[in-house]
Amino acid sequence: MRDTMNLIPMVVEQSARGERSFDIFSRLLRERIIFLNGQVDDNSAALVCAQMLHLEAENPKKEIAFYINSPGGVVSSGFAIYDTMQFIKCPVATLCLGTAASMGSFLLMAGERGMRVALPNASIILHQPLGGFQGQASDIERHAQNVMRHKRRMIRLYAEHCGRAEEDVERTLDRDFFMTAEDAREWGLVDHVYRRRAGDLPLIAPSS
């Protein structure tokens, strides 16, 4: 069976200079829309960060729409995307469609305040960083200490972006915590739940 992710549609546009074709994601990038679809790893993080930096270079004041459908993945890769979102001058709006789990939910909440959106049937899952290690006891201990540092950092940032006490966040992350879109809005992870495209919603407004 062919991998459907390799079957990327092409968009053909007519202009005074003739015909140009783009893959669908490149065309959406022209509208300042970035997709994270699948695992958060070094490759996907590099693509997302590069696209954000490119759009900032084009227009540092215009927002970026970041669509997320991800089960999570590598913590360090997720932090690379998070840091880029905070570093660039463009406001980054986030939208969850499908699932935002683990690092996916972390990136969803990292969007510009007031511009974090979930679609009504989205699923959001929070949990603490995971780690599985092998080797000498001293190496395992060091890895465990590193995971705990990641956990403390994530707790602090969830609390900061969601307006919750760190103790509350720590209890929530202790086990897999499943949220509906409305649950996520009440918890402070997103600001809005939209069923239909809103004409005044910057996240999905076409570029002019």
UniProtKB/Swiss-Prot annotation:
Q: Which domain of life is it from?
A: Bacteria
Q: Would the keyword Protease turn up in this protein's UniProt record?
A: yes
Question: Enzyme class, one word?
Answer: hydrolase
Q: Where in the cell is it found?
A: Cytoplasm
Q: Subunit details for this protein?
A: Fourteen ClpP subunits assemble into 2 heptameric rings which stack back to back to give a disk-like structure with a central cavity, resembling the structure of eukaryotic proteasomes.
Enumerate the UniProt keywords alphabetically: Cytoplasm, Hydrolase, Protease, Serine protease
Example GO molecular function term? Answer: serine-type endopeptidase activity
Organism listed in the record = Chelativorans sp. (strain BNC1)
Physiological role: Cleaves peptides in various proteins in a process that requires ATP hydrolysis. Has a chymotrypsin-like activity. Plays a major role in the degradation of misfolded proteins.
BP terms from Gene Ontology:
protein quality control for misfolded or incompletely synthesized proteins
- Quote the InterPro entries the UniProt record gives: ClpP (IPR001907), ClpP/crotonase-like_dom_sf (IPR029045), ClpP/TepA (IPR023562), ClpP_Ser_AS (IPR018215)
Q: Which residue positions are annotated as catalytic?
A: S102 (nucleophile), H127
PANTHER family, A to Z: ATP-DEPENDENT CLP PROTEASE PROTEOLYTIC SUBUNIT
Give me the gene this protein comes from. clpP2
Q: Which Gene3D superfamilies match?
A: 2-enoyl-CoA Hydratase, Chain A, domain 1
Taxonomic placement:
Bacteria, Pseudomonadati, Pseudomonadota, Alphaproteobacteria, Hyphomicrobiales
Q: What's the EC number here?
A: 3.4.21.92
Q: Do you know which NCBIfam families this protein is assigned to?
A: PRK00277.1, PRK12553.1
**What does UniProt give as GO cellular component?**
cytoplasm; endopeptidase Clp complex
UniProt catalytic activity: Hydrolysis of proteins to small peptides in the presence of ATP and magnesium. alpha-casein is the usual test substrate. In the absence of ATP, only oligopeptides shorter than five residues are hydrolyzed (such as succinyl-Leu-Tyr-|-NHMec, and Leu-Tyr-Leu-|-Tyr-Trp, in which cleavage of the -Tyr-|-Leu- and -Tyr-|-Trp bonds also occurs)
Q: Which family does it belong to?
A: Belongs to the peptidase S14 family.
Pfam families linked to this entry: CLP_protease (PF00574)
In its UniProt entry, what is this protein called?
ATP-dependent Clp protease proteolytic subunit 2
